Design a protein with these regions (language model features):
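Short, contiguous, helix-prone interaction/anchoring segments in small proteins
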Residues: 49-67
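A short alpha/beta connector and helix-capping loop motif
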Residues: 65-91, 96-97
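Short beta-strand segments at enzyme active-site cores
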Residues: 96-103, 211
Length: 254
């Protein structure tokens, strides 16, 4: 005997039964692309892939933000903006799931560990007031994503209190619900939030492909080391690829 699942649905005379159908939240692309990467070439099912753009926030990338207040050269992070924008446009065109993340805290800082809040110069600490509002506080202008990569309506935004995008968020649930097993990862900084997120994802069974020119660091040597650690020993945490091979592959998807 076969038991078919049913759901209740609204009807003029109350409720009736309808056959259950899986929820479609986006137009799926049934396509497999081949991608040159390190440590080796990959075959990727776009139906099971998502683009995760990490922390491309004004506080990190714009003059007057948190990163600049710490004495960093924000132009080094902005080098990733154009490649990210190109990949984002291609991912949207083929219907890939796009997820954005932002690091920041509640206005009362109850979700921020004391040692994190007390780090550094008191004038530039998390929660202090800067040119773009309170530093790394949710709802402030500096906390938001830069205009060049701003999320479209319907694109999920993960607000995270830590370095990794899985810690204290519903990112894993979101990916599991959509059948995602592969993540294309972009964002900043390579050695901190990108690396932490990739390691978290790897431990949860997701395959990660880090797009090297779509990531950046205030310190070029940290960027290089972060990428090297991901692809080391046969891809211990994931793979590394440039954006151009991915763009070329996506260009062939109708």
């Amino acid at each position: 005997m076969i038991i078919l699942p049913f759901v209740f649905r609204a009807a003029d005379n109350g409720l009736d039964l309808a056959p259950w159908q899986p929820l479609q939240t986006r137009e799926m692309v049934m396509a497999t692309v081949n991608l040159e990467a390190e440590p080796g070439p990959l075959s990727v099912d776009l139906h099971k892939s998502a683009l995760v753009i990490i922390d491309m926030q004004r506080d990190f990338l714009e003059p007057g933000g948190f990163g600049a207040a710490l004495g960093n050269d924000v132009s080094r992070l902005r080098a990733a903006v154009v490649p990210c924008r190109e990949v984002l446009g291609a991912a949207r065109r083929v219907g890939m799931l796009v997820i954005h993340t932002r690091e920041g805290h509640r206005p009362d800082l109850t979700d921020a560990p004391p040692h994190k809040v007390l780090r550094g110069d008191p004038a530039n600490r998390i929660g202090a007031r800067g040119p773009m509002g309170r530093i790394l506080v949710r709802g402030e202008p500096g906390h938001d994503i830069i205009p060049e990569l701003y999320p479209l309506p319907g694109e999920p935004v993960i607000d995270k209190p830590g370095k990794g995008a899985f810690y204290q968020t519903d990112l894993e649930l979101m990916l599991r619900n959509r059948g995602i097993d592969t993540l294309f990862v972009c964002g900043v900084t390579t050695e901190v939030c990108v690396n932490t997120t990739v390691r978290e994802a790897n431990d949860r069974g997701f395959r990660c492909i880090v797009l090297s020119d779509c990531c950046a660091s205030y310190f070029p040597e940290f960027h290089a080391a972060g990428l090297a650690m991901i692809k080391a020993q046969g891809g211990i945490f994931g793979s590394v690829a440039g954006s151009k091979p991915l763009l070329n592959s996506l260009a062939g998807v109708p």
